[in-house]
Amino acid sequence: MDSKYIRNFAIIAHIDHGKSTLSDRLLEMTGSLTAREMQAQVLDAMDLERERGITIKAHAVRMLYKAKDGETYQLNLIDTPGHVDFSYEVSRSLASCEGALLIVDASQGVEAQTLANAYLAINNGLEIIPVINKIDLPSADITRTQEMIEQAVGLDATDAIPVSAKTGVGVPDVLEAIVKRLPPPTGDPNAPLQALIFDSWFDAYRGVIVLARVMNGTLRKGMRIRLMSNGKVFDVESMGVLTPKPMEIGELSAGEVGFFVATIKTVSDTKIGDTVTEDARPAAEPLAGFEDIKSMVFAGIYTVDSHEHTLLRDALEKLRLNDSSFFFEPESSVALGFGFRCGFLGLLHMEIIQERLEREFDLDLITTAPGVRYKITMTDGSTLEVDNPSRWPDPSEIEQVEEPVIRATILTNEEYVGGILKLVEEKRGRQQNFEYVTPTRVMLTYELPLNEIVLDFYDRLKSVSRGYASLDYQLAGTWVSPMVKMDILVSGEPVDALSIIVHRDFAYERGRALVSKMRELIPRQQFEVAIQAAIGSKIIARETVAALRKNVIAKCYGGDISRKRKLLEKQKEGKKRMKRIGKVDIPQEAFLAVLKVGEDSASKN
């Protein structure tokens, strides 16, 4: 097909603003699916995607649309994840397009992720069509939403298209706007091949399936291709397009989007953002914008039943086949046995992996408190990167610690600003910007340590704002901070799985809260149990779980006091001996207490 009849576009929106529903309507109206094949959220194939109402993986669907001008156009919809953890995937998906539909909920207005993804689209030079969705809701306010789009995003919203993706009202106008307002792709089909990988997944029968947008040249079946980031060479076995059912074709030329299967065995070879070129006639340089995805959040994952350790390893390897952005390595803990240290893109990514392990592989898991990666400069001038408290060096050898920092954008209603400011200050935030987007809607920009975000920030932000605040963030460098490792000792023995890295100024209250929480959770023993929080050799907080005592003087009726004293002394000696040799079993809830401490201190405020 002539490239002037091709339109490549993405749909960008905040979670729950109706992106997947609009995609369904477009598929229905272009006749890509029969009524029988239609089901809600066609493109969200994973159960988790449907349940949480989020898109986790990118998808690409080809539709044929006969426009009012009588021509048939090929529309390639690239469905992108909306969540901040997957923003690199979004940026690569957007780089595959010439235009984007910016969907805004008419009742909620512009949210933080709408903004973040809209800026990504603008930076990629895309033509943006604003679409105001959910106009069938009684609380819909089209005029106010247009004003918000103009003020917050800086786009002209006078010709924004009002639609209801649920009922189908206004959707034909969206199709016409895609054809009329979005530019066709540019690219020379005869130039050396350059194709951008924007997603890949593993199929048990065919190996790795790669989604790509051909920028220049033509990709053909049987061609020997080379991946430009690692120089690996593969043969293309088959290729095609998703309509959304896979349909095999012989070639993809400049401007087209489709999938190909080559002799690739692992997803880690096909990095998102990489450039595919022909081995015999390679392109002079790769497409711009490729980055290696780095894990941001780290946690230990262990099985409740230590015999299931090998099952956990197999499950993680299977998940890694489909998700090269998360990594794991074996680690062992005295308290929890054998497990794995895992790295994730963010908190949602961690939750999704954990839920998939429990749901798809039927495993019972314990997850340790999530942490981040610190850069440590030692007194001898060398540097270390540490993401696990157990590898924290001796404090006397540390010169300085740098912690990762994020730039957070929070959009909220003005009545909740006070509570949010208090929360952000508590989390060591530094204000960058404060502006009114509309008379009642405020946009706050803060720099915050990632370490403070990973535990409970999002939940607390939602509770402070009664669910009306939305958050988006990206990495913004590092700060030098006095971070220390805090150990929890039970009966004088450090429990490695409970160690955490904290800011020195907050160590005392964090330690105090943690040991008092542990005191409630560790069952009473026959001997007293000391629970201590320590930084190095210095104890900063202590609680004691009192011993269970039998009433040894119950059998004494009257008589001399020395008889009773003798029995009590004898009991005390026995308890002392027990304490020396006794072992304390720490229940699973105690490990989860590390995660909950912040929430409890918040609910008391």
Curated annotation (Swiss-Prot):
One of its GO terms (molecular function) is ribosome binding. It is found in: Cell inner membrane. Pfam families: EFG_C, GTP_EFTU, GTP_EFTU_D2, LepA_C. Disulfide bonds: none annotated. GO terms for cellular component: plasma membrane. Its EC number is 3.6.5.n1. It catalyses: GTP + H2O = GDP + phosphate + H(+). It comes from the Bacteria. GTP binds at residues 16-21, 133-136. InterPro entries: EF-4 (IPR006297), EFG_III/V (IPR035647), EFG_V-like (IPR000640), EFTu-like_2 (IPR004161), LepA_C_sf (IPR038363), LepA_CTD (IPR013842), LepA_IV (IPR035654), P-loop_NTPase (IPR027417). Belongs to the TRAFAC class translation factor GTPase superfamily. Classic translation factor GTPase family. LepA subfamily. This is Elongation factor 4. The lineage of its organism: Bacteria, Pseudomonadati, Acidobacteriota, Terriglobia, Terriglobales.
